[in-house]
Amino acid sequence: MFKTALVTGGNGNLGRLVAQNLEAMGTRVVSFDLPGSEGPHCDPRHAVVLGDMRDQSLLEDTLATHKPDVVIHLASMLSGSSEANPELAWDVNASSSIRLMRHCLDRNIGPFFFASTAATYGPDLASPVALTR
């Protein structure tokens, strides 16, 4: 499996689950998330980097320091806040994601996993959504 995984959005709902599963498989986990996202729900075994996806120097330092061999990119603005501030959402959700991918390519870090959102499929979804949809 992987030696070290960087999980962006690692303190969020999906990020915590992914990080726990990676940890259970013996992978060292580095969670990158916003300040204020840490708390009792966070696994103390994981390294935590608190910062903003738009802070490229912090992302570069995180990659250089922790040397992940896989990146699971889950950090993003949610739909409500994205609709309220579309320019910021574009910078966080799109531009920062592209920059992170470029940093990984420059350092030969891979694989790179990106998870989108069920909101991609529209507002009237049954829950849960079938994988075949």
Question: Where are these predicted regions, by residue range?
Answer:
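N-terminal Rossmann NAD(P)H-binding glycine-rich loop of SDR-like oxidoreductase domains
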Residues: 5-25
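Conserved glycine-rich Rossmann-like NAD(P)H-binding loop of the short-chain dehydrogenase/reductase
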Residues: 27-38
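Conserved cofactor-binding/catalytic machinery of classical short-chain dehydrogenase/reductase
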Residues: 55, 70, 96-99, 111
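Conserved Rossmann-fold NAD(P)-dependent oxidoreductase catalytic core, especially the SDR/UDP-sugar
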Residues: 98-133
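A hydrophobic alpha-helix adjacent to the NAD(P)-binding/active-site core of NAD(P)-dependent oxidoreductases
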Residues: 48, 89-90, 104, 112
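NAD(P)H-binding glycine-rich loop region in Rossmannoid oxidoreductase-like domains
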Residues: 53-92, 123
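SDR active-site strand-loop-helix element
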Residues: 8, 32, 71-75, 112-118
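Rossmann-fold cofactor-recognition segment
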Residues: 43-55
